[in-house]
Amino acid sequence: MRCPFCGEADTQVKDSRPTEDGAAIRRRRFCPQCSQRFTTIERVQLRELVVVKADQRRVAFDRDKLARSIRTALRKRPVDDERIERIVNGIVRKLEASGEAEIPSSEIGELVMDTLKEVDAVAYVRFASVYRDFREAKDFKAFLGTMDPSK
């Protein structure tokens, strides 16, 4: 693994542990060249997923982009980082388990919305406002009218 500080190609693994959910390996590394320490996380990738955008462009699936979107929706909400990681892992597993190499972006968006609906109503509305491109207050009002009032 290349050192992110100095670019040295030969680094040493000092510690390896599975993550809490067991879906990845967390490795603590040391660079003998610059004496810096850093952490890497390794995950099993079952297949290369391709996202089909609305305009039919195809781009490689970006797990980090999915995580950023979910973190943005959950910003300042009472959901910890470990839970967010489990949410992201769950969505990625569903996408990989679908058996499809190409996934429409709309399917990913709906999976995120379904998940956020169960986790946090405010995050659900935040994500929906971007995903469904709300332009005016009436868009929010119409969307909120479709929600279960007990949530």
Curated annotation (Swiss-Prot):
Keyword Flavoprotein: no
Gene that encodes the chain: nrdR
Biased segments, Basic and acidic residues type: 11-21
NCBIfam families the record matches: transcriptional regulator NrdR (TIGR00244)
Region (Disordered): 1-21
Protein name: Transcriptional repressor NrdR
Pfam families: ATP-cone, Zn_ribbon_NrdR
Cofactor names: Zn(2+)
